[in-house]
Structures are given as structure tokens and as C-alpha cells.
């Protein structure tokens, strides 16, 4: 089963003045029709603007219940990440969280495909057997995503940010965003992973994290020291 609004209309670029008029945008829905991959069905499951829709939720859960595997496409919409405003929290829309919980009850074999341009809280990540973070894919990203999901390509990306457990864990939580004219940057050198590593704050996924379909093993490592120091 393929579930999620982003499978129909991919989040492939930013919003505001960064938006461009693409000559063509590939979607998972369209790519599946020519891929030869058989699916039990494809539905949106939720409204992109965050509104609850019980009929869409029920349709998605029913589809998940009669499927072997669920590919759930979700994340942040264009209005969540745009110029001229600061995000007030790091959560995905609540209607998507609610659907994740219901889908997990219907089918334990769920794979999440995330579309987001920045860090999100992930208290629901244990519901997924695997997570693929696609960021903003560009106009031809759907084909690349299918290549990874089908095993044609081995994923090799690494996180460029630390995915924290909750916003309150960040050192800037108490004074950002600013309530006055000026924003205060008090972290000093302890920005991102430097803070979490130094303070020993647990995170969901650390900076540089990323898995592939390959298992690596190193042995008999040797270091030849010349002028360098290890």
C-alpha cells in the first residue's frame, strides 16, 4: 500500500521567492504506474493543510489492513517551511501523527518516507521498520526514491543535522524565537552536535547518521604515523 499526500504531490522545493515553475514534476503515483511494481492501492490518507478527515483516515487504515507492507509518505508542507517566518515547534502536523498511530495498529510492516527541509521531532519513529529521509527531492526525485525503495540503488546519505528527541532539549529553547527586535545567539561554539555530544543529551539520530543495505565490517586496521598525530 502507498499512503500519503506527498506520494501524489511531492514536496520538491521550498516556498516563497525560492519557488520555481518546473517543466515537469515526477510523483510517486505516476512513477508507480510505469515501474512494474504492484501495489494494493494508493490513497492520500490525510489533508496536507493539517485538517482532520476521518473518511480519508478510514480509507487509509482499511488499505493498510489488507496490505503486506505500507509505504507512508509524510512530512512538512510548504507553509511550514517558508521565508519570512520562524517555526514555532518541530512537530509534523497532528493529523499525520494520528494517522501513523492508526496505521501502526493495522499493519506492523510500515516504512516511512519523510519530506522535510529541516529537523522534526519523531516520537512516533518506533512505529516504522525503516525511515527514508528524502528532504526536498527536486522535480525528478520520485524516481530516485523508488530506486532506493526497490533496492535498485543502495542508500548512502548521511544526516546533516542532529535529529533531537524534543525541541526542549536544544540549548536555544528558552530564548528562541526572540520576543523582542533582536535574536540572541548564546550557544557560542556549542551549535548542533557539539552541544549534544558535550552535554551528553540523548538524541533520536545523531549528526552524520545514515544506514544502507550493506553490512560493513573492519578488521586488522593499522595506522602508520609519520608527521601526523592520531
Ranges and model annotations:
Residues 1-229:
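C-terminal non-catalytic regions of proteins with extracellular/luminal or membrane-system context
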Amino acid at each position: 500500500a502507498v499512503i500519503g499526500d506527498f506520494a501524489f504531490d511531492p514536496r520538491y522545493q521550498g516556498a516563497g521567492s525560492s519557488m520555481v515553475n518546473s517543466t515537469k514534476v515526477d510523483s510517486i503515483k505516476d512513477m508507480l504506474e510505469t515501474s512494474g511494481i504492484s501495489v494494493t492501492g494508493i490513497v492520500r490518507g490525510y489533508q496536507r493543510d493539517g485538517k482532520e478527515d476521518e473518511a480519508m483516515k478510514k480509507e487509509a487504515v482499511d488499505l493498510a489492513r489488507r496490505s503486506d507492507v505500507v509505504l507512508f509518505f509524510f512530512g512538512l508542507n510548504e507553509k511550514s517551511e517558508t521565508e519570512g517566518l520562524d517555526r514555532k515547534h518541530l512537530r509534523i502536523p497532528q493529523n499525520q501523527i494520528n494517522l501513523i498511530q492508526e496505521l501502526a495498529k493495522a499493519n506492523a510492516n510500515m516504512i516511512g518516507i519523510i519530506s522535510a527541509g529541516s529537523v522534526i521531532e519523531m516520537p512516533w519513529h518506533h512505529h516504522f521498520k525503516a525511515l527514508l529521509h528524502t528532504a526536498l527531492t527536486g522535480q525528478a526525485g520520485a524516481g530516485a526514491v523508488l530506486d532506493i525503495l526497490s533496492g535498485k540503488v543502495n542508500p548512502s546519505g548521511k544526516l546533516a543535522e542532529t535529529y533531537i528527541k524534543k525541541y526542549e532539549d536544544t540549548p536555544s529553547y528558552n530564548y528562541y524565537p526572540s520576543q523582542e527586535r533582536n535574536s540572541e545567539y548564546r550557544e557560542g561554539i556549542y551549535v548542533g552536535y557539539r552541544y549534544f555530544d558535550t552535554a551528553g543529551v540523548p538524541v533520536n539520530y545523531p549528526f552524520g547518521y545514515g544506514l544502507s543495505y550493506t553490512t560493513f565490517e573492519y578488521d586488522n586496521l593499522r595506522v602508520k604515523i609519520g608527521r601526523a598525530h592520531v
